[in-house]
């Protein structure tokens, strides 16, 4: 939030999980905190009784938020409630069609909480509830605002929606060095790969410290070099990985495509890794250079 504000963003910025030590900066940079417990509420009010915040309710995810039985005490603490900018909650399974009954139960409870708050405070509150999957699957409940998260990266919650979205990032690296590995030689930590024949391998300067899971070693995935797939060899290292380029015409310095929007998306890497695209994208290290391309 501070970086966005310092970069010239003037629109409201919601801080979803603030800590008590963050409150001074929240006030200084005019950020809007999520207030989710009485401990956080009381400490924030000790800093400012007028600064706007978003009040979060737990409707079934059982992560953060007040419960419906807390409304009376919230009223006693907040009085007119003029510093409540939004009421909100978070859906726990909006991407799963098999959990529609659960999700509709969350929505109904959120509506009940919102009405109880409005009746108690004698005012109508703005509300937000939906994440990307919620927008796609429960668009009738957008209320006053939505929280598009992974949708901004061009990913939805199923293949049909993904076809209509364009992933916004690619991840590339280069071949740092090429080695000829002889039969019976090993590659990588713990001798994770033993050559049963002669190989040519490429060393790529990206590893699990950058978000490339160690589970993707030993051929679990391949990366594109000069439009050919080079499977991983050996274990993924912290800062490097090795690939088989025996049958690929390439040289040191050639580009290696790790993630792209056509041949190998974050969704596909997530499927190979037995996880989701969220984990792949959020794991990408801040030490990797970002290049922003404007159309």
Region spans (language model):
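Fold-independent oxyanion-binding glycine-rich loops
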Residues: 18, 36-38, 57-59, 90-91, ...
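Active-site loop/helix belt of alpha/beta enzymes
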Residues: 42, 46-52, 57-174, 181-182, ...
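C-terminal accessory subdomain/extension
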Residues: 180-295
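N-terminal active-site wall of soluble small-molecule enzyme domains
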Residues: 1-31, 35-44, 51, 137
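Electropositive phosphate-/nucleotide-binding environments in soluble metabolic enzymes
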Residues: 20, 35-38, 65-68, 100, ...
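A structural signal for short, hydrophobic beta-strand segments that form beta-sheets
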Residues: 15, 175, 232-233
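A structural micro-motif
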Residues: 11, 31, 51, 82, ...
